């Protein structure tokens, strides 16, 4: 079979004006970025404001293997399947971060015959949104250090600055740096560090903002440091929220592209799900809901991370909950949770599937606890056997949950027709949605509910630092914000090697970081890196561009 990039380059891509017409947008409703990409101005959302919202389908997954389980691929293929059934459908996805693309993933725009196009552009610089976020983030750092240099009128304690610079690359050497060296003319010496851009609070702010005015208000609330009295210092205290919003003016607009089969796709924003909330922008999802009858969207990593955050964080800003949830499962991941070594995942092992099913079962019950109908999509791989597939189907159906075998990687929309048909029936009913916790509950209760009811743990322990931070959060009146758990994606717990569905474990919250602009409190569990490193053999080693500009090596 051809590689992803070979399939993408051989596909017949339509002018973006044609794609816009499919969802009722005229030439004047879009801003062109070349022939195959466009931005949708915020006024368009206002224009369709009276339109009823379409149905919203959330695609999530079980705890993945390091290779991922094809959640984006299933999301794209499902949208194409609905389009084949003449449904007015759109897909809404996050945009890839360049760091992981050049590090491990090699690309993140779907796979096989279920991709979004232009694949090379989307995986690289796209419309420049992430670069704008990088600039906005680092501008705040520059203004902060200038304030220190110019007499420190805000009385900022340089030892208590929490705002870091960012870069959209995996670069472990920049995690901890010292700046301001070289004498008085070069600023105030202090410790600093770099995060990857998609871990920046600016990314989360952009993805949760609903307008330019909301963007400015959120930017102003971002806490960047403490002063010598241990009081918070914000971007608003620097007085630069207007300038930062100006830098993000165009990045706030959703990006319109297409799938291989010509289904309209909005790709906008890309916060990590193991660090931030892991969902595409509220504005993109809102826009899609006004323009389409069915919207397929995804949340990063498993249902314990991106799925939980979509439901407890994003829906509160979106003003709408999903009408159904698709949980993507693969037999290789279930076998991994069943104790099979990563090198043996392609060998048949029915007993391991049965043992690893505990992971999928917990995810199913978790999503059902929100009052949402659930269907399992088996993302089929060539190594899957009939015995393994039938075993997984039997186990899933025994829970009263529908299951569909999908082959969208190999067949595109055709391989998702069964999933689309089963979902169509599920979408007729209105779910009785309920949140995991209420915002007015104490932060300790919210943490406990996520850990005990979603993860299956028994207790939350706070480090001395986290205890102090919780007191500060309460003193500052930030207790009514949702929690955003930052942990490993491979396990329900905070330990990557605790697979399947562990019980009775305790988790330790190392830090509680207030992200007041985004509107949530990040709880750091375990050893989560906000600036990844490159592997021994980065995916970039296989990437190249020919003399005529043709790209190779993305996958």
UniProtKB/Swiss-Prot annotation:
Record: residues binding ATP: 65-72
Enzyme Commission designation: 6.3.4.3
Keywords carried by this UniProt record: ATP-binding, Ligase, Nucleotide-binding, One-carbon metabolism
InterPro entries per record: Formate_THF_ligase, Formate_THF_ligase_CS, P-loop_NTPase
GO biological process: tetrahydrofolate interconversion
Top EC class of this enzyme: ligase
Membrane-traversing stretches: none
Pfam families: FTHFS
A molecular function GO annotation: formate-tetrahydrofolate ligase activity
Annotated pathway: One-carbon metabolism; tetrahydrofolate interconversion
Domain of life: Bacteria
Record's catalysed reaction(s): (6S)-5,6,7,8-tetrahydrofolate + formate + ATP = (6R)-10-formyltetrahydrofolate + ADP + phosphate
Family label: Belongs to the formate--tetrahydrofolate ligase family.
Protein name: Formate--tetrahydrofolate ligase
Organism: Lactococcus lactis subsp. cremoris (strain MG1363)
Recorded name of the encoding gene: fhs
């Amino acid at each position: 079979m051809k590689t992803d990039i070979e399939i993408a380059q051989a596909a017949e891509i339509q002018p973006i004006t044609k794609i816009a017409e499919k969802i009722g947008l005229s030439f004047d409703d879009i801003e062109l970025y070349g022939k195959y990409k466009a931005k949708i101005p915020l006024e368009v959302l206002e224009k369709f404001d009276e339109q009823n919202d379409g149905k919203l389908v959330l695609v999530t997954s079980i705890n993945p293997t390091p290779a991922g389980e094809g959640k984006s691929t299933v999301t794209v293929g499902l949208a194409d399947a609905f389009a084949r059934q003449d449904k007015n459908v759109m897909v809404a996805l996050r945009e890839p971060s360049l760091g992981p693309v050049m590090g491990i993933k090699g690309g993140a725009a779907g796979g096989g015959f279920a991709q979004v196009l232009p694949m090379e552009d989307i995986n690289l610089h796209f419309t420049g949104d992430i670069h704008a976020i990088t600039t906005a983030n680092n501008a705040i750092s520059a203004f902060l250090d200038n304030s220190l240099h110019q007499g420190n009128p805000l009385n900022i304690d340089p030892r208590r600055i929490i705002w870091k610079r960012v870069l959209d690359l995996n670069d472990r050497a920049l995690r901890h740096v010292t700046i301001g060296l070289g004498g008085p003319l070069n600023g105030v010496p202090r410790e600093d560090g770099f995060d990857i851009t998609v871990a920046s609070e600016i990314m989360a702010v952009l993805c949760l903002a609903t307008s330019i005015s909301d963007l400015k208000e959120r930017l102003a609330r971002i806490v960047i440091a403490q002063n010598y009295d241990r009081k918070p210092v914000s971007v608003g205290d620097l007085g630069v929220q207007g300038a930062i919003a100006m830098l993000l003016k165009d990045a706030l607009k959703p990006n319109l592209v297409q799938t291989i089969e010509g289904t309209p796709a909005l790709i906008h924003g890309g916060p990590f799900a193991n660090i931030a909330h892991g969902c595409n922008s509220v504005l993109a999802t809102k826009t899609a809901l006004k323009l389409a009858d069915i919207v397929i969207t995804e949340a990063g990593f498993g249902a314990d991370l991106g799925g939980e955050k979509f439901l407890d964080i994003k829906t509160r800003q979106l003003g709408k909950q999903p009408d159904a949830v698709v949980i993507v499962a693969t037999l290789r991941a279930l076998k991994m949770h069943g104790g099979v070594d990563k090198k043996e995942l392609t060998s048949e092992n029915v007993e391991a599937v049965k043992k690893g099913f505990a992971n999928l079962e917990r995810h199913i019950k978790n999503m059902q606890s929100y009052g949402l109908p659930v269907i399992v999509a088996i993302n089929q791989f060539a190594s899957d056997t009939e015995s393994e597939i039938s075993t997984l189907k039997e186990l899933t159906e025994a829970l009263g949950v529908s299951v569909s075998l999908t082959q969208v990687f190999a067949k595109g929309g055709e391989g998702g027709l069964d999933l689309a048909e089963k979902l169509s029936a599920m979408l007729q009913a209105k779910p009785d949605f309920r949140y995991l916790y209420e915002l007015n509950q104490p932060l300790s209760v919210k943490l406990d509910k996520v850990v005990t009811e979603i993860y299956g743990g028994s207790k939350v322990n706070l480090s001395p630092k986290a205890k102090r931070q919780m007191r500060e959060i309460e003193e500052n009146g930030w207790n009514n914000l949702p929690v955003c758990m930052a942990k490993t994606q491979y396990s329900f717990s905070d330990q990557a090697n605790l697979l399947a569905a562990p019980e009775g474990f305790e988790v330790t919250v190392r830090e509680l970081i207030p992200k007041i602009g985004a509107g949530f409190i990040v709880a750091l569990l375990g050893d989560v890196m906000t600036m990844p490193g490159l592997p021994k053999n980065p995916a970039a080693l296989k990437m190249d561009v020919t003399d005529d500009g043709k790209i190779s090596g993305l996958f």
